[in-house]
Amino acid sequence: SALSSNFGATGLHAVMPNYPATGDVAAANKILDDAGYAKDSNGVRMKAMFDLIPYGEDWKRGGQYIQQVLGEIGIQVELRYEDVPTWLKRIYHNYDFEMNLNYFYQLSDPVLGVHRHYGTNMIRKGTHFVNSSRYSNPDLDALLSAGMTEPNAEKRAAVYLEIQKILADDMPVVNLFELEFLTVYNTKFKGAY
C-alpha cells in the first residue's frame, strides 16, 4: 500500500494486493516478450541506470538485490552511488534518473507525508523529498484535496482507500518494503545528549 501500516489504527491504511515474495520469473519474462521487449543474444532486453540513495551500505545492498532480480528477466541494471549533494541535485533538481531507490517518511498524517510524494502540486523542481517521479493524476489530486479537508473519519478513510487503489494501479512508486526505525534504550545509559 502507498500508506504505511502505521495508519491502520486510524482506519486510513488499506491492505492492498500483495505480490509474491519470490516472483514468477517465467511469467515476467513472458509479459515482457509479449510486450515486444525481446532479449538480445546476451539475454539482455533493456538497460537501466539505478540511482541509490547514498545513505550507507544497506542501500547499496538493496540496489544489488534489485540488479540481481531484474537481471533474471533480462533487464541489465547499472548502479550509481554518489555523494548526497550530487544525488539530491540529480533526483530533485535535474530529474536526471531512470530509477531511484529512496524512502519516504509518512509522518503522523498522510497529508504531511503522503501527499508530497504523489500530488501534482508537489512537482517542485529543486525541492527535496517531494514528487520527484513527476507523477500527475487529476483524479488522485482531487482525492488528495478531499482527504485533506474531510472531517468525518469514515468518509476520510473511504477517500484514502480510493487513493491507495489508484496508486496501486498506476504504480508511480514501487513500494518494496516498509522501513521501521528502531529505538534502543537502557536506563543505565546516561549523558547521551
Where do the PLM segments sit?
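Detector for C-terminal structural segments
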Residues: 1-17, 58-68, 85-193
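DNA breakage-rejoining catalytic core of tyrosine-based enzymes
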Residues: 17-23
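Immediate post-signal peptide segment of exported/extracytoplasmic ligand-binding proteins
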Residues: 25-49
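Bilobed "Venus flytrap"/periplasmic-binding protein-like clamshell domains
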Residues: 25-29, 52-67
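Surface-exposed patches in mature extracellular/periplasmic domains of secreted proteins
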Residues: 40-41, 79-81, 159
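Short, well-ordered beta-strand elements
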Residues: 45-54, 78
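Short, well-structured beta-strand/strand-turn elements
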Residues: 72-85
